[in-house]
């Protein structure tokens, strides 16, 4: 499958699911959180649209992404959904751009790069959540 031919929201849909698995694995295996209520609370720090949007700002400022990934992000971010242009919509669009990157890389079977981005992401969230 050629991910560049897919709608950016489809890439984001897939990327959201893939990213969620990486974060759940991190919380259970690395952080050793095992109580469902604690897992749910911890997951919010990592999978929220606000966290993803904040990470993307940092990633762009620090050069953590390739030119190709930035182009995928912009494509995913700029895909028009329904609704007014308010702060919540803008954050959601930025989050969709991040998820589109993950979905695109997954379809290209670039799992090492996904892990690298997720590792940057986890460190960024852990540093910024307090």
Predicted regions and their residues:
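Double-stranded RNA-binding/processing signature
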Residues: 1-130
């Amino acid at each position: 499958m050629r991910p560049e031919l897919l709608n950016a929201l489809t890439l984001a849909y897939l990327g959201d699911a893939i990213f969620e698995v990486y974060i759940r694995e991190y919380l259970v295996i690395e952080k050793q959180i095992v109580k469902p209520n604690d897992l749910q609370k911890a997951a919010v720090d990592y999978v929220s649209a606000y966290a993803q949007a904040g990470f993307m700002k940092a990633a762009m400022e620090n050069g953590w992404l390739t030119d190709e990934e930035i182009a995928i992000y912009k494509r995913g971010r700029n895909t028009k959904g329904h609704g007014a242009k308010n702060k919540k919509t803008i954050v959601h669009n930025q989050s969709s751009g991040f998820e589109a990157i993950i979905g695109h890389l997954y379809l290209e079977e670039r799992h090492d790069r996904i892990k690298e981005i997720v590792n940057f992401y986890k460190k960024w969230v852990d540093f910024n959540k307090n």
